[in-house]
């Protein structure tokens, strides 16, 4: 539970930066480095033409192209767990706050978001540092275009 409190504190600070007009509050450069260290084993970022922009063509996790402010669990041809699909169907999108909390405790975040103690996330990796997660979100926000309708589209 303390991870949620820490994540909430960091994202509260981040939210004030976003409210001031910033798309995200982290360092894009630091996020790129952390993505290379922590995410590439499972994820890629490939554009709509299939060009890999980041990652090693991993197939364990979904493509993270256009992640920022997109619906959870909606990348075509990826087999998500039921809980993350359900979260997306309730209108959840990848905001900085949601991303930071999720990557620190995927199952815990889904259980809280869905108010369902049986919900489980498929992502086994947990990011330890909230600032790393904020930076990675900032980096991912630069890769891809926002969906035409907020809250819809690919994850």
Task: Label the model's feature ranges.
Residues 131-151:
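C-terminal partner/receptor-binding element of secreted or periplasmic proteins
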Residues 2-10:
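Sec-dependent signal peptide recognition
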Residues 46, 71, 106-110, 144-147:
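A general structural signal marking secondary-structure boundaries and capping sites
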Residues 50-55, 76-95, 104-132:
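Axial heme c-ligation environment in periplasmic c-type cytochrome domains
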Residues 16-36, 44-54, 60, 151-155:
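Electrostatic cytochrome c docking/interface patches
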Residues 33-45, 62-66, 100-104, 121-124, ...:
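C-type cytochrome heme c attachment motif
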């Amino acid at each position: 539970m303390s991870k949620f409190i820490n994540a909430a504190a960091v994202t509260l600070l981040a939210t004030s930066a976003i409210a001031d007009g910033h798309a995200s509050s982290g360092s894009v450069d630091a996020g790129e480095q952390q993505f290379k260290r922590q995410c590439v084993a499972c994820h890629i970022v490939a554009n709509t033409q299939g060009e890999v922009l980041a990652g090693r063509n991993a197939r364990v996790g979904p493509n993270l192209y256009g992640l920022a402010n997109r619906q959870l669990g909606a990348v075509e041809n990826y087999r998500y767990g039921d809980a993350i699909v359900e979260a997306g169907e309730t209108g959840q999108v990848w905001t900085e706050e949601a991303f930071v909390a999720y990557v620190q405790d995927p199952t815990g975040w889904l259980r809280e978001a869905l108010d369902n103690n049986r919900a489980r996330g498929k992502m086994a990796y947990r990011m330890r540092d909230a600032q790393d997660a904020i930076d990675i979100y900032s980096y991912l926000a630069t890769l891809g275009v926002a969906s035409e309708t907020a809250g819809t589209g690919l994850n």
